[in-house]
């Protein structure tokens, strides 16, 4: 069984939520002939504003409300009504509290949402989270969500073992002032998040798609180079798709074949082994 997936390495303009929404809407309309053939389309983390500091939250709220964002995303999803959209992630206010949340929308309906667990930098002063995972289906394919730095927490991905076929990870991963990078000719960050994704996929017996923003990003309080390097890993085949494309507005397409993954599950059974050793109380 094949699931047809697309993604954009979209680079937002800092704190210009309405403008970014307009650009995203235009991208979907421009690529609608291709998107109509896709089952799933993903945008990166913070795709509407970029990361914020606590003292910028008032400006964010003046720009647009969380309810208005949700209404806009629902409307955008109707452009291709048969496609499911993972709407990156954004700061979502619910019950008076913010979280870094990814919302899954299809034809104007929210299917599920997921809040980032591994909060980092200014997120610790703005966001709250929970221990809930999110699962939705595309045909017979079950899909889960994680966000960016969650990759460092194996525990998050263990919750999906035997429950999903694919985990999607919207990300906003840059070079981040890595002082160690100057000592090496290759990208440490790309090696880091690629190795983590491969490990999470193989140890839990599911495929993994990492979708990262790309390009030079600038806000009022920091600048960064978003690394791109989005990739798709499908055990036992390994990485079957990776891009070095630097255009944030390019639609990338991946085909997810479930058959190799089912073969991996049958012969390696790393997901079943986890639960076996857990009952033995050795972990």
Regions from the PLM with identified roles:
Residues 68-84, 152-249:
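CN hydrolase (nitrilase-like) catalytic-core segments centered on the catalytic cysteine
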Residues 9-15:
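Short polar catalytic/cofactor-binding loops
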Residues 44, 88, 117, 170, ...:
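Conserved residues at the C-terminal ends of beta-strands
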Residues 25-107, 174-199, 203:
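Cys-nucleophile CN-hydrolase/nitrilase-fold catalytic domain and related Cys-dependent amidase chemistry
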Residues 1-7:
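Extreme N-terminal starter segment of soluble prokaryotic enzymes
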Residues 64, 93-195, 253, 257-272, ...:
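Active-site catalytic loop in hydrolytic enzyme cores
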Residues 20-30, 153-158:
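Short, acidic/polar
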